[in-house]
Amino acid sequence: RGCRLGISFPEIYEMQCRAIFEALAQLKKKKIKSAFVEIMIPLVSTEAEIKIMKDLVVNIANEVQKQHKLKIEYMVGTMIELPRAAIKAKEIAKHAEFFSFGTNDLTQTTFGISRDDSGKFLNDYLDNKIFSIDPFVSIDDGVADLVDIAVEKGKSQNKKLKLGICGEHGGDPKSIEFCSK
């Protein structure tokens, strides 16, 4: 799953990246100036993982650019969806132009619970005030702390680091309020 697949079977990611960059090259040849892509490396937990995967992406992009004799615009970033990635964000940001916070997985891995089986106990946790909110609906304060840590550490390494969020929290007003800070 995630970048592990690309490290264990790089030919899969090479094929996917080549297809993306070939499509981008075709758009550039058609003079579509807005043609741009962001490649997001998923489930990164170490600097080495993103470095290996970014090198793969850059190599394929260079091959396609050379083959088509044109420059293509792209960025490489990662999804921050593991607590370790948030804690090691400074090192990861050395090789990322953006972070997208995968708050669904970050919530699951922070609590050690699965959305698939949380329905069996979540109401009990809410009734007993173990959780004040459903952490899969609104960002929990512990998950928010991990996001804050990752933003601070990532931006300390790369001032231009672009930030985003993906997942269901992106549609929740309380979570949006947190992200706007």
Residue ranges and their predicted role:
Residues 1-181:
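Conserved alpha/beta-domain cores
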